[in-house]
Amino acid sequence: MLKKIGFTIGKYAPYHIGHKYLIETALKDMDEFYVVVYDTPELKIKIEDKIKWIQSDFPDVKILKAYNSPKQYGLDEESVKIQMKYLCKIIGDIPVTNFYSSEEYGKCVADYLEIENVVVDKERKIFNVRARDIRNDVEKFKMYLNDGVYRDLREKR
């Protein structure tokens, strides 16, 4: 039987309960799962902190670091091609079968790699939170953060 190998990508700036839910969902279904963590120096959150936060909930999850990602985003053909060339370098020879996300771009990633697209809580009905909202008001959204993430964000202010 074919081994089910999934992955997700994200900035995790900061890591929150919606991310945790997505990873938990994937781990239930996959034999192996990778989390691609993008470095985002412009957001002033170190990639090492993001990895620490994720591994505090999932010590055995496989992490792939994504440094110096292309700055061109979007769902237009050119942007997708640029992002996918970069992402393919990150995942390398890993024979992925499933892509997990809560975002519109999930279909583009899955189609490009010719793998299954798994959409998790896209409408944010289970956890109505986005990292950008947390960045804008940590106190208002702290209930969506684990203690370590909240503490680190408070210390960095």
Each PLM stretch: what is its role?
Residues 1-157:
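Nucleotidyltransferase catalytic core that binds NTPs
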